[in-house]
């Protein structure tokens, strides 16, 4: 089977069986989604959804979180993986949102990646989910499965996988394709 046929088959299957693909993380605004995605690194969405209600309640804006400390944030997120690093990233992210972006989560992938705790995958999730940009978030699962079913030519990195996938997926489907 040719690669183009493989892509078409996969996209058709998902369009038929999962017509509304969306994140399982619970959030009400871009700031909350950014926090949730940062926390979800090497952690389940279920666990993140258990701890974010209290975090979102007590730190409803970047301004409030920026005024806090990583020690305080740690107490809210202690049950996620790597809470020490993530608590520092969240406070740093909030401070940078306030100082560099007027408290607004940026839509540009390069700008997003300047925020502490935000790598390419997280930036792509925010760009695609919040701003409906054609950004492909490639995590370890997408990377592994894309290689396994022949959507890529044995790419060696998530970035190689991302570039290969976006070449073959229609632009309007990219924002939902990573789900």
Regions found by a protein language model. Give the residues of each.
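Catalytic cores of DNA base-excision repair glycosylases
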Residues: 2-179
């Amino acid at each position: 089977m040719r690669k183009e046929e493989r892509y078409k088959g996969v996209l058709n299957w998902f369009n038929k069986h999962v017509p509304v693909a969306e994140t399982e993380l619970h959030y009400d605004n871009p700031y909350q989604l950014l926090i949730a995605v940062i926390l979800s690194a090497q952690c389940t969405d279920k666990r993140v959804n258990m701890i974010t209600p209290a975090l979102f309640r007590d730190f409803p804006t970047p301004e409030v979180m920026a005024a806090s400390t990583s020690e305080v944030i740690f107490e809210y997120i202690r049950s996620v993986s790597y809470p020490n690093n993530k608590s520092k990233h969240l406070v740093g992210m909030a401070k940078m949102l306030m100082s560099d972006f007027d408290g607004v989560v940026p839509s540009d992938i390069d700008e997003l990646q300047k925020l502490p705790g935000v790598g390419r995958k997280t930036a792509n999730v925010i760009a695609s989910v919040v701003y409906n940009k054609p950004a492909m978030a490639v995590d370890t699962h997408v990377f592994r499965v894309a290689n396994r079913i022949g959507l890529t030519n044995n790419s060696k990195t998530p970035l190689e996988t991302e570039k290969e996938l976006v070449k073959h997926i229609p632009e309007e489907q990219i924002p939902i394709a990573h789900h």
